[in-house]
Amino acid sequence: MKMLDKTLPLEELESSLTKTESKAYYLSKLVYRHDKVVNNKAHILQRKLLNLKKQLFYGLTSYQKLCVARHKRRPTTLDYIEYLLDSWIELHGDRRGSDDPAIITGIGRIGRRSVVVLGQQKGRNTKENVLRNFGMSSPGGYRKALRVMEHANKFKLPILTFIDTPGALAGVSAEKSGQAEAIATNLKKMFSFEVPIISTIIGEGGSGGALGICIGNYVMMFENSIYTVATPEACSSILWKDSTKAADAAEALKVRAEDLLTLKIIDEIIPEPFGVAHDYPLLMVRILKNKIRDQLDFFDTFSPSELKHHRYLKFRKLGLYYDC
């Protein structure tokens, strides 16, 4: 089997592999119990295809990682909540007349623990994306998230946040409603909470929109997620007045998990099964659940004041710089 030509568009390569993988699976089912030789060959083909998939998603450029993070089949916050929690109830509204569908909030249980969960939610299709503002939260969304987090702090419940947004909602209505103030208030309040906050970047982590719910004691990031001060397209338009330079901007912004771990912006990279979460969502959930449980166990030993101080010190030490 030939090596992959990574000069081709990522979507084209993945589509070709997926079609071949489906044909191999169909072939193995078709000949099952009828022709062992052909059946064995089909299994060999499937293994080779799996290796090619690993190869495809290994060593991606920053912009290719961005494409994977935006994949239409990539699991969303709701997908993870549904399978991570043994039971949960969604909570609505910011108590100021708004209930932003771009942010999901709720309370549930992982094993014997009660937890509060929240995260940005993208749609699966155009209609859903319009409803959820493509995962871009309004000021009401951040206030809803804050209301639920304050509930968690009051009742001493751990907070789990999931980040997947290109950024906060930009527009006249959002600015009139106090977008900057809503995000700033979240940042301030999250530093004051005396419960563990575990944040996971599952897709796009864009700008202040991501940071507004990402002040965590522990910040994890999926292998093919991105975390950035601005989208590469926006950055290239601002710096070079040319949106076609988005790939160059992505490299300069250091959006990849590997770069961010080196720069000490995040605490851990969560590997995606066989290189990609959207083809193996249930396996991805199991991996994430174990990681979250480990961190909940770790922070169980901290007192409320220690949790608050730990978060403060973490962000005081954030980042890495070099003297020129």
From Swiss-Prot:
An annotated Gene Ontology molecular function: ATP binding
Cellular component annotations (GO), alphabetically ordered: acetyl-CoA carboxylase complex; chloroplast
Substrates-to-products reaction catalysed: N(6)-carboxybiotinyl-L-lysyl-[protein] + acetyl-CoA = N(6)-biotinyl-L-lysyl-[protein] + malonyl-CoA
Pfam families registered for this protein in UniProt: ACCA (PF03255)
Subcellular location field: Plastid, Chloroplast
Matches recorded under PROSITE patterns: COA_CT_CTER
Keywords: ATP-binding, Chloroplast, Fatty acid biosynthesis, Fatty acid metabolism, Lipid biosynthesis, Lipid metabolism, Nucleotide-binding, Plastid, Transferase
Similarity annotation: Belongs to the AccA family.
Annotated function: Component of the acetyl coenzyme A carboxylase (ACC) complex. First, biotin carboxylase catalyzes the carboxylation of biotin on its carrier protein (BCCP) and then the CO(2) group is transferred by the carboxyltransferase to acetyl-CoA to form malonyl-CoA.
SUPFAM superfamilies hit by this protein: ClpP/crotonase (SSF52096)
The keyword Flavoprotein appears for this protein: no
Protein name: Acetyl-coenzyme A carboxylase carboxyl transferase subunit alpha
Domain CoA carboxyltransferase C-terminal: 44-298
Pathway, per record: Lipid metabolism; malonyl-CoA biosynthesis; malonyl-CoA from acetyl-CoA: step 1/1
Subunit structure: Acetyl-CoA carboxylase is a heterohexamer composed of biotin carboxyl carrier protein (accB), biotin carboxylase (accC) and two subunits each of ACCase subunit alpha (accA) and ACCase subunit beta (accD).
The keyword Transmembrane helix is annotated on this UniProt entry: no
Enzyme Commission number(s) from the entry: 2.1.3.15
GO biological-process terms attached to the record: fatty acid biosynthetic process; malonyl-CoA biosynthetic process
Disulfide bonds: none
Domain of life from the UniProt record: Eukaryota
